[in-house]
Amino acid sequence: MSGGRFDFDDGGAYCGGWEGGKAHGHGLCTGPKGQGEYSGSWNFGFEVAGVYTWPSGNTFEGYWSQGKRHGLGIETKGRWLYKGEWTHGFKGRYGTRQSTSSGAKYEGTWNNGLQDGYGTETYADGGTYQGQFTNGMRHGYGVRQSVPYGMAVVVRSPLRTSLSSLRSEHSNGTVAPDSPASPAADGPALPSPAIPRGGFALSLLANAEAARAPKGGGLFPRGALLGKLRRAESRTSVGSQRSRVSFLKSDLSSGASDAASTASLGEGAEGADDAAPFEADIDATTTETYMGEWKNDKRSGFGVSERSSGLRYEGEWLDNLRHGYGCTTLPDGHREEGKYRHNVLVKGTKRRVLPLKSNKVRQKVEHSVEGAQRAAAIARQKAEIAVSRTSHARAKAEAAEQAALAANQESNIARSLARELAPDFYQPGPEYQKRRLLQEILEHSESLLEPPDRGAAGLPQPPRESPQLHERETPRPEGGPPSPAGTPPQPKRPRPGASKDGLLGPGAWNGEPSGGSGGEGSRPATPAAAGAGRRSPARPASEHMAIEALQAPPAPSREPEVALYRGYHSYAVRTAPPAPPPFEDDPQPEAADPDSAPASPATAPGQAPALGNPEPAPESPAKLEPKPIVPKAKARKTEARGLSKTGAKKKPRKEAAQAAEAEVEVEEVPNTVLICMVILLNIGLAILFVHLLT
């Protein structure tokens, strides 16, 4: 047998034994352009046993056949290590795959390089799945057993679908803690403030609406005489448990394989005794087990999920959520049964005066419970088969370790022979492994330094800034004139300067129904002085009074009586837009007054002495006045006195009567609402009595 160095046209080279024009014996070969290296034994051009090293530093140590990995061997790829059998270049039939960083692993059968058949998946926190696999996913029947809640791993990676399988190349991926959702393996991603825990898909989540509603709700308060009639409902009916806050709800789960978070967002309706416990209150020793069907790596079909605390669900599942008919048994012994939709009980939870007949629902629930129990029994059988397959895979893994030792021996012989035949021949394999080792050290050091930097730099600041920005952008009412309830009758004098160029001041349309003002917070059509000084709404009332006291009273005019007359009826503010009053369009033959203008209605001539503060010429109707005025009762007395002294004409009297009727209509609105409420109450009573009789 001859030997030497042979260079190929593609840039590769071979140095070792040669016979019949083919590599034979021991030798070392590099790939095209010197990329990759195989060192070991050869048989007429084909590898037999040795070590193949990729430029990335990944290695395979084991046996070959017809140029493909076949037999027993160990593959090191990134942070994953496979030990076991190989068939024509693919993993299988039996083998184990383990993460060198987290300890997660799979032990069982393989097909075409994927988990297929029966096996055991052990997760980073120690939780396990034993059962069937198809095309690398949990599919069929199986048992998922979690570790105690205090030891359960916190899963933050939305990229992985399993903690230890081939379904993820991002085995050590992490996402920022402020991400909207951190999916795990036992449910879809849902927004939640909680952190997912490996293997926990059930959560004792209080229903927010039920928590806010009183337990004796309905049409009557809890202390009412007839309110106690609601206690006639049965504890075993589908609709009887709707006042309890015991609904199980998957709060935060993922499309990955092992983590669903549990968090309690509500409290019980009747205090601590009826309140559902928060997830923080779960005992650290609590564990959770699921036995049933799996489809496409998710809990789907019939199954039973149970916690060591007594929480139990039997029924149908879909995509890691309770979906279909099932029964939930709470830790306190109460049961919740009915139809679930995406983890929410949709039948029997709504508050209704007439609960639906639930015979058909109970039959479907019983059927689903029986199916779940059968599925759990089958899952236990499949788990036993998986245990036997796991033990066989472990034996193959031990044999693969022996095969790897033999392959390394062949590799060392080939390297020694290559150095003898060609001392200057470059062997890239050791350099690849050194580079990979250095890269792993750097990644490990970065992973130790990254979390504190992220937490200290960017995470705490956004939550503190966002609320303040929103508060600044939120419009707030400015400080306006004092409340009409606390304003004495005298300050209504400065009305001429109250308007502000047609702009509404604070509280101009609110009306502020205080006891002393009768809701006269603003009057849209009150005339104001054209040359009066305008003031800011934020100026104190005392300052307004000081300025107004210095104003010289102009010539007597009838506009003050018009303003007072409008202020007497507050309905114009609430029912009519800011425009001239409606009674100016109704001319009367008696109202032939040369001083009246289209913007101001007819006035009573003798009211200036009663007011004691005549106002200047009128303003346009668009100018509005936010200043509160004298209470309604006093305005009415003043108006009556003025009319009696001066002998007002028929038009103001007729308009006053119409305005009074409109005011009465406005005041009768609450009576109409009260009548409607009484009618609804009677209807509810009738329905309740019919329900009790039936």
Curated annotation (Swiss-Prot):
Family annotation (Pfam families): MORN
Please tell me whether the keyword Cytoplasm is annotated for this protein: no
Q: Where is the composition biased (Pro residues)?
A: 478-491
Q: Which residues cross the membrane?
A: 673-693
Highest taxon listed in the record's lineage:
Eukaryota
Modified positions (Phosphothreonine) in chain numbering:
474, 487
Q: Which organism is it from?
A: Oryctolagus cuniculus
Q: What protein name applies here? A: Junctophilin-2
Q: Name one GO molecular function term.
A: phosphatidylinositol-3-phosphate binding
Q: Where is the composition biased (Polar residues)?
A: 235-244
Q: Which InterPro entries match?
A: Junctophilin (IPR017191), MORN (IPR003409)
Q: Where is this region: Disordered?
A: 164-192, 231-278, 448-663
